[in-house]
């Protein structure tokens, strides 16, 4: 099968130069291998068509495209390159991961919008990349079809199986999709595309393959089966282990970036807020018992149940009674916005620094649903893979500093929020019961901070007392759950 590009017309009396490009067949695949042959006179092949003048162009052209860092949103103008998933010379397809970048709010994976070959990386690891500037150069491969005076030709029969398109139509598909069809011996002309303008997508190939052959697609990943919880052991006092020094040697200077840069902005803004502090202790004896009863049930559902879901739900119930604590103020403190959703943030310590993802809509979630979301956020936070959506939109914050150590803290408000709580370590301490007898109690201290410009001390105290009552008597939460 051949397509001819006639560079000049010729007369039957005088031969002119003709350049011919052949499409050679390799197995079941058409591979474009240009072979330029010069003839004087008529070409040595015959057109299987009654018309004499056939002008067709088929050419593969490579183009270097500067792949620029697009706007990530949230006013982010610069990011830090944390990891490259490609190197120069690698072949990429659309939606393949190019690199991972980190802003002062979240880590984002950048994906390719082109099929082609990576020609240049503009940044090294830990370099600062700017929105709108080139990230990589990609040499694209686009089949450029320009037809003049197109005349349909009869289909050419081959002994070998070939992928031929419907006459007069062009099948839209990326090279990756064509490769998938080729590997599974599928004619693209028989597949109905679901993409724009009938473009054939990868899903269309997989669906076609499943219908034709009954192929079983790879199963979706199942929930990881957690090992049975270990039996509780006698509590022993841990012996401090001295670790080798983290840093020795000469002084060095490095720029503040990533989450540390976000902390600079947030804490500088928080310094302008007059903080009101309030501390109290909470007896969690009954909650500790309840959690031990619910842990096996949560484990059967694949959920790791900590105390935090109870703390968040109790806080949400309290915010329903004191909505001023779930509000925000503008920069000049002229307007108060009361938030309908309780998006409660959790201060999380990671290798990348302090991050505060939030659980969305705590007011409509159950304890188990909150625990499931916390498990997800903690897993992504440890891997540095939290999305921007996980980190924005917070309305109230709890900091579980007690998981590391400490009894009291002085939490700093995260603008534009107006309140935050810090939770201390749960300790077994002697306390008096209602009969005046000394008994063992599970005590946790809590420290609150509120924006004293719009929140008075009495409001914080009443909120804390209500939150405390829910945790000291977990059954009370059932009365107010909706």
Curated annotation (Swiss-Prot):
Residues found modified as N6-acetyllysine: 196, 202, 243, 250, 289, 295, 304, 435, 440
FT transit peptide: 1-61
Subcellular location: Mitochondrion matrix
Annotated positions of the N6-lipoyllysine modification: 105
EC number: 2.3.1.168
Comment on bound cofactor: Binds 1 lipoyl cofactor covalently.
Tissue expression pattern: Expressed in kidney (at protein level).
Pro residues composition bias: residue spans: 218-230
UniProt main location, coarse: mitochondrion
Cited Pfam families: 2-oxoacid_dh (PF00198), Biotin_lipoyl (PF00364), E3_binding (PF02817)
GO molecular function terms listed in the Swiss-Prot or TrEMBL record: acetyltransferase activity; dihydrolipoyllysine-residue (2-methylpropanoyl)transferase activity; lipoic acid binding
Enzyme class: transferase
Protein name: Lipoamide acyltransferase component of branched-chain alpha-keto acid dehydrogenase complex, mitochondrial
Encoding gene (name): DBT
């Amino acid at each position: 099968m051949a397509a001819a590009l006639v560079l000049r017309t010729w007369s039957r009396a005088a031969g002119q130069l003709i350049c011919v490009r052949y499409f050679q067949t390799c197995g079941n695949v058409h591979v474009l291998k240009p072979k330029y042959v010069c003839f004087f006179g008529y070409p040595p092949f015959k057109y299987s068509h009654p018309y004499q003048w056939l002008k067709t162009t088929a050419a593969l052209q490579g183009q270097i495209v500067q792949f620029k860092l697009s706007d990530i949103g949230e006013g982010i103008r610069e990011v830090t390159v944390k990891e490259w998933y490609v190197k120069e010379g690698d072949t990429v397809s659309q939606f393949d991961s190019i690199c991972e970048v980190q802003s002062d709010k979240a880590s984002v994976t950048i994906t390719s919008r082109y099929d082609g070959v990576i020609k240049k990386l503009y940044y090294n690891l830990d370099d600062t990349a700017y929105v709108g500037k080139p990230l990589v150069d990609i040499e694209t491969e686009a089949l450029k079809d320009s037809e003049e005076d197109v005349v349909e030709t009869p289909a050419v029969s081959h002994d070998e199986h070939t992928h031929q398109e419907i006459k007069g139509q062009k099948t839209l598909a990326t090279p990756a999709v064509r490769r998938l069809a080729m590997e599974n011996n599928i004619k693209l002309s028989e597949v109905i595309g679901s993409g724009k303008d009938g473009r054939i997508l990868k899903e269309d190939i997989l669906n076609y393959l499943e219908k034709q052959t009954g192929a079983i697609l790879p199963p979706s990943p199942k929930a990881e089966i957690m090992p049975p919880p270990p039996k509780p052991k006698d509590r022993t006092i841990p012996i401090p282990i001295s670790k080798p020094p983290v840093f020795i040697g000469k002084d060095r200077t490095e720029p503040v970036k990533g989450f540390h840069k976000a902390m600079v902005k947030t804490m500088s803004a928080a310094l302008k807020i007059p903080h009101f502090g309030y501390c109290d202790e909470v007896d969690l004896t009954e909650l500790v018992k309840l959690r031990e009863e619910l842990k096996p049930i949560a484990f059967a559902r694949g959920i790791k149940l900590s105390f935090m879901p109870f703390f968040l739900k109790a806080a949400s119930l309290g915010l329903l009674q004191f909505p001023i604590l779930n509000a925000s103020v503008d920069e000049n403190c002229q307007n108060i916005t009361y938030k309908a959703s309780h998006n409660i943030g959790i201060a999380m310590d990671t290798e990348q620094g302090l991050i505060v993802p939030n659980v969305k809509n705590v007011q409509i979630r159950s304890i188990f649903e909150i625990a499931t979301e916390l498990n997800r956020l903690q897993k992504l936070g440890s891997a540095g893979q939290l999305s921007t959506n996980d980190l924005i939109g917070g309305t109230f914050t709890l900091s579980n500093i007690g998981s590391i150590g400490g009894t009291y803290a002085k939490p700093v408000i995260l603008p534009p929020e107006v309140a935050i709580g810090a939770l201390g370590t749960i300790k077994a301490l002697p306390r008096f019961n209602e009969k005046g007898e000394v008994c063992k109690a599970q005590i946790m201290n809590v420290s609150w901070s509120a924006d004293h410009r719009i929140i008075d001390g009495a409001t914080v105290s009443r909120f804390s007392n209500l939150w405390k009552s829910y945790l000291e008597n977990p059954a009370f939460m059932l009365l107010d759950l909706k």
